[in-house]
Amino acid sequence: MSFSNPRRRTPVTRPGTDCEHGLSLKTTMTLRKGATFHSPTSPSASSAAGDFVPPTLTRSQSAFDDVVDASRRRIAMTLNDIDEALSKASLSDKSPRPKPLRDTSLPVPRGFLEPPVVDPAMNKQEPERRVLRPRSVRRTRNHASDSGIGSSVVSTNDKAGAADSTKKPQASALTRSAASSTTAMLPSLSHRAVNRIREHTLRPLLEKPTLKEFEPIVLDVPRRIRSKEIICLRDLEKTLIFMAPEKAKSAALYLDFCLTSVRCIQATVEYLTDREQVRPGDRPYTNGYFIDLKEQIYQYGKQLAAIKEKGSLADDMDIDPSDEVRLYGGVAENGRPAELIRVKKDGTAYSMATGKIVDMTESPTPLKRSLSEQREDEEEIMRSMARRKKNATPEDVAPKKCREPGCTKEFKRPCDLTKHEKTHSRPWKCPIPTCKYHEYGWPTEKEMDRHINDKHSDAPAMYECLFKPCPYKSKRESNCKQHMEKAHGWTYVRTKTNGKKAPSQNGSTAQQTPPLANVSTPSSTPSYSVPTPPQDQVMSTDFPMYPADDDWLATYGAQPNTIDAMDLGLENLSPASAASSYEQYPPYQNGSTFIINDEDIYAAHVQIPAQLPTPEQVYTKMMPQQMPVYHVQQEPCTTVPILGEPQFSPNAQQNAVLYTPTSLREVDEGFDESYAADGADFQLFPATVDKTDVFQSLFTDMPSANLGFSQTTQPDIFNQIDWSNLDYQGFQE
């Protein structure tokens, strides 16, 4: 069976529908495809029977009276709806009723943006809408060729109505406090955790014959786990303990079941993860937790036994909604721990922990000083520190501000304020009129006295170093003490600190040095080595007897070549004058520059030979004179005037002085000249010995090469030497 689309049939025209003013559409006008997108040359004369005619569009009111009448009708309809809603409302009816005043209007057509219906009140069929005023005819046809818009709304409404009949799952009363609106989003126990709970908790409880009465509680646990009423071990603990009183016939049976459950849960904890043990924010499982849990179970069992015996709570313990709960006591109030009490209408107070009557009129325990007084009156500490009177006013305890204009400093103690204000007034003036401090002044008298002693005193007080013969003197005692601390290791005990941490010093005891006033000769003065170890040392395996450069130079009094500003001039001083002129110097100092600053390190003089050899005789280099290394008493050697030119020949002049060039130090075998006497070399021959009688020549005849060697035809090498230049004739007979 075929029929044409009703929307494309020729509309039925009715007489009298045309508006005289031309505001209505002519329904006889037809639209053709060609006329829609093209401009025809001539209008069509006839209309086909299948042409589409759009329905008449609704128009707004064009007259003022129509607008006013429509507003009045709308207000009347709204007031009528309010009256109907109030007439249906009842204060005594507790059953919920659908809200009659519900705005279900949408800014867009409901057929396009209809949300899923979740409220049953919106699912009811709306009554026919009353028209404010007559409208133009709108053709609405319900036929089999509907586009299907809104079919999803009907199916959604049907589903919403069916959902009302289903029972919504509710959280258990035991775990409802911990559950939130996002219970469905919480993770459930894993399959492994469920098996561990069944093996270590549920099975032992079911196998114990004395706990048959609690079997329904244990058997209901798997269902609670599946419904997420139990999502951790703590929920299982609450379920078993809080539901046990319903099945317990005696307090002993209740204690047996609860303690057994606690032991089973304690054995199960180690098999579960932290998330599966407790909920977020709960107290974790520890040994202390299980001890407290058992104690609470014992107390609850005792209360349960008391209730079973009496049949109900005592009359004085009956709970009334009008009772007032109050926190009473405290260490700061009456010296006892704070506790919750319940105050009845007659004023009787009962402890919620023990159930005993609390005497609220009892005087607090006398304390020497309560914590509340210290907490509330913090100014008491400030008063005790500032030595203020006990009943000082807040103005007296308040910080004191400086009265100097522009100064914003505050002080808690008046003495600190007075001391600070003197830095502005500077009352101590210098008595010398020409001094600038005569007008400017000093904050303290001590500073003024120190200024006068330093600048204006003719005979200032001097503070001498206590370590004689140290010549240090200072006008200030603090400077002298600092000198003794740094130079002599003296312990400087400071009465006041400046806030800086004093560095720790090793060996703070003062080291006394024997004075050198009775020492007359330099040879008796001990030689002190430099305390700082040398940086560049020669390998001991290569040169075991060779000292380092710095040690050798410091020991023998020679300075390194890098010190250019030092005066190397030598003075021939007598022992008496040397000893008397250097008694004021200390034997040594611990400074790093004492070698450069002092005139003589060890207060010793140098004895120089009467005539020094020429530089050509010692390869243009000369060794510095040696100082004594060992404490050896020797007689000073007298020098004999040289009559002839000094030579290096062993058979030459008797008192010739021999030197070892410093250039041969690299090939030295470790022989040193540490046993030299007072800086002078030994004499080869005594001055009173006749060399012609005692010492003979080394060779009477020239040795021959034929002394057991196989080569007898060797030339005589001694014949090639000219012996006349060596003054050899003087040693022949």
From Swiss-Prot:
Residues 148-158, 503-515 have a biased composition (Polar residues). GO terms for molecular function: DNA binding; zinc ion binding. The keyword Phosphoprotein does not apply. It is found in: Nucleus. The keyword ATP-binding does not apply. InterPro entries: Zinc_finger_trans_reg (IPR051061), Znf_C2H2_type (IPR013087). Residues 1-22, 34-63, 89-183, 497-533 are annotated as: Disordered. GO terms for biological process: regulation of transcription by RNA polymerase II. A zinc finger (C2H2-type) spans 400-424, 428-456, 463-488. Residues 39-49, 171-183, 519-530 have a biased composition (Low complexity). One of its GO terms (cellular component) is nucleus. Residues 1-11, 132-142 have a biased composition (Basic residues). Binds to the promoter of the cbh1 gene and activates transcription. This is Zinc finger transcription factor ace1. The gene is ace1.
